[in-house]
From Swiss-Prot:
It is a multi-pass membrane protein. This is Potassium-transporting ATPase potassium-binding subunit. The lineage of its organism: Bacteria, Pseudomonadati, Pseudomonadota, Alphaproteobacteria, Hyphomicrobiales. Part of the high-affinity ATP-driven potassium transport (or Kdp) system, which catalyzes the hydrolysis of ATP coupled with the electrogenic transport of potassium into the cytoplasm. This subunit binds the periplasmic potassium ions and delivers the ions to the membrane domain of KdpB through an intramembrane tunnel. One of its GO terms (molecular function) is P-type potassium transmembrane transporter activity. Pfam families: KdpA. It is found in: Cell inner membrane. GO terms for biological process: potassium ion transmembrane transport.
């Protein structure tokens, strides 16, 4: 651990906080239908989309109608991705002559990208054509990100509105998010990435001759445009198998830093949107503070663990920390910071091999996902996930003082608490249940490259990542099998939609309630006490739910390595 390393972490946090308010102001205007500096150009396009699709932008939807529209939208996205992957061999823009993708892998990938998970049981450069990367994956990266933000806006409206039955219009929210937020930023972002050295071409793969005289094929393609939205939209799926560790996806320290910023930018800004729409920006800052406390703690532990190395390394006289699986152009701090960011934000992109982290260093990304990736989280998903924990925290506070719980003027009653618990309990049910199957079912055990606690952690990480819609992996596990393609797809599906539906039910319930003015007995929700309460609820629920599994995996691995046993 060095002063330069800590300065990088501090600089990252300062820039994210600085971006939160202006981005939040802009996004609030966009979703309220107010004029922005892009309106002269984009408003005619927006109106044209509504006219062609037959959408009345002034007609809002009940929460159930909003949810059904979202589900139908995902069905369409699934069919597009699955179709282009199965027909890849006969479609254009396939310079490498890639064949059709197998049914189970196509199914897994389609579910993966519509759920914003981007779990990849394939290597992009050796499996997919340019058309599939663009029309199937990059296209869906925009739509899944826009969907997440739209759902967050619906829940925010549930808190901010009173005595109404509507939470917005799904089609309008997705259109505005894509046109006014994602596309403009990604255009500029793509140009920056091209300047940094990332390819953006539809030309053939490059044939090169090495210094030894051997022939080598260098994969290129429309990479920069996909990287821009995969980071900004917290999708995470790489154009190349090595993801952000590949020099054609993340060539420089500057591109790496900007990519980390882009992962957090919109998620952090949504906390400010929440504060603005409920009429008190301090509410948004309090939520961001909860996220910040958990994030800084995770970064500190991961950086310390990786910089300290392992007892095995110390016994061999090795110093300099654990550099296994890390790119020297990034080093320890940027690799550790990236790992915590990508798992806190449900992004899943990686610039280092998480499987090669120390036991404790790899445990923090795992915990981030097990908590539901609420530390900023995926665009939209992080905020509505955090608000579920806020509902529980407010309920606990109400029990302690003997009053009906209230939050931003809305009573938190049995229906909201039940829905919040349903959404939160679905996650451990899926990844703990499937992990139990994965470590005893013979076809699943055959995919494990390591035995002992590390092998167990690989399986636990895979199902946690899939259920949490993250997509990163402990890559020692062979995932492209029938068992894992189907089970991981089921985990991704349940983790996405069985959390969304309860959250939308809460939105509808709250929107229909009257707004209650604060009184002397109202629990304050903008100060340190509230922040501490929410952090405590998150850690208690996480500790009770996940500690036994963590004890069987990374914790026992760490203790065993200190005793001289490796896996």
């Amino acid at each position: 651990m060095t002063m330069i390393g800590w300065l990088q972490i501090i600089l990252f946090c300062v820039i994210i906080v600085a971006l939160t308010k202006p981005l939040g102001w802009y996004m609030t205007r966009v979703f309220n239908g107010e004029r922005t500096f892009l309106s002269p150009v984009l408003r005619p396009i927006e109106a044209g989309i509504y006219w062609i699709s037959g959408v009345d932008e002034r007609r809002e939807q009940h929460w159930l109608t909003y949810t059904v529209a979202m589900l139908l939208f995902h069905v369409g996205g699934f069919l597009v991705i699955y179709g282009v992957m199965r027909l890849q061999a006969v479609l254009p823009f396939n310079p490498a002559g890639q064949s059709a993708v197998a049914q189970d892998l196509s199914f897994n990938t389609a579910i993966s990208f519509i759920t914003n998970t981007n779990w990849q049981n394939y290597g992009g450069e050796s499996t997919l054509s340019y058309l599939v990367q663009m029309l199937g994956l990059t296209h869906q990266n925009f739509l899944s990100a826009a969907t997440g933000i739209a759902l967050a806006m619906a829940l925010i409206r549930g808190f901010s509105r009173a005595s109404v039955r509507t939470v917005g219009n799904f089609w309008v929210d997705v259109t505005r998010c894509t046109l006014y937020v994602l596309l403009p930023i990604c255009v500029v972002y793509t140009l920056f990435l091209v300047w940094q050295g990332i390819p953006q071409t539809l030309g053939d793969y490059v044939e090169a001759t090495t210094l030894e005289g051997a022939k080598q094929t260098i994969a290129v393609g429309p990479v920069a445009s996909q990287v821009a939205i995969k980071m900004l939209g917290t999708n995470g799926g790489g154009f190349f198998n090595a993801n952000a560790a590949h020099p054609f996806e993340n060539p420089t320290a500057l591109s790496n830093f900007v990519q980390m910023l882009s992962i957090f930018a919109l998620g952090a800004a949504l906390t400010n949107v929440f504060g603005r729409m409920v009429g008190n920006q301090r509410q948004g800052w309090a939520i961001l503070a909860v996220m910040g406390v958990l994030f800084v703690a995770g970064v500190a532990v991961t950086y310390w663990a990786e910089a300290n190395g392992t007892s095995t390394m110390h016994a061999l006289g090795l110093t300099g920390g654990n550099m296994e699986g890390k790119e020297v152009r990034f080093g320890l701090v940027a690799s550790s910071l990236f790992a915590v960011i990508t798992t806190a934000a449900s992004c899943g992109a990686v610039n280092a091999m998480h499987d090669s982290f120390t036991a404790l260093g790899g445990m923090i990304p795992l915990i981030n996902m097990q908590l539901g990736e609420i530390i900023v989280g995926g665009v939209g998903a992080g905020l509505y996930g955090m608000l579920l924990f806020v509902v529980l925290a407010i309920f606990v506070a109400g029990l302690m003082v003997g009053r009906t719980p209230e939050y931003v003027g809305k009573k938190i009653e049995a229906r909201e608490v039940k829905m919040a618990m349903l959404a939160i309990l679905v996650l451990p049910l899926m990844y703990l249940g499937w992990t139990a199957v994965g470590v005893v079912y013979p076809a699943a055990v055959a995919s494990m490259a390591n035995a002992g606690p590390h092998g167990f952690t690989e399986v636990l990480y895979a199902f946690t990542s899939a259920t949490g819609n993250n997509g990163s992996a402990f890559a020692g596990l062979t995932g492209n099998t029938l068992f894992y393609n189907l089970t991981l797809a089921s985990a991704m599906f349940v983790g996405r939609f069985f959390m969304i539906v309860p959250a939308m039910a809460i939105a509808g319930s709250l929107a229909a309630k009257k707004s209650i003015p604060p009184s002397a007995g109202t629990f304050p929700t903008t100060g340190g006490l509230f922040v501490g309460l929410v952090v405590g609820v998150i850690l208690i629920i996480g500790g009770l739910t996940f500690f036994p599994a963590l004890a069987l995996g990374p914790i026992v691995e760490h203790l065993a390595m200190n005793a001289g046993q490796v896996f």
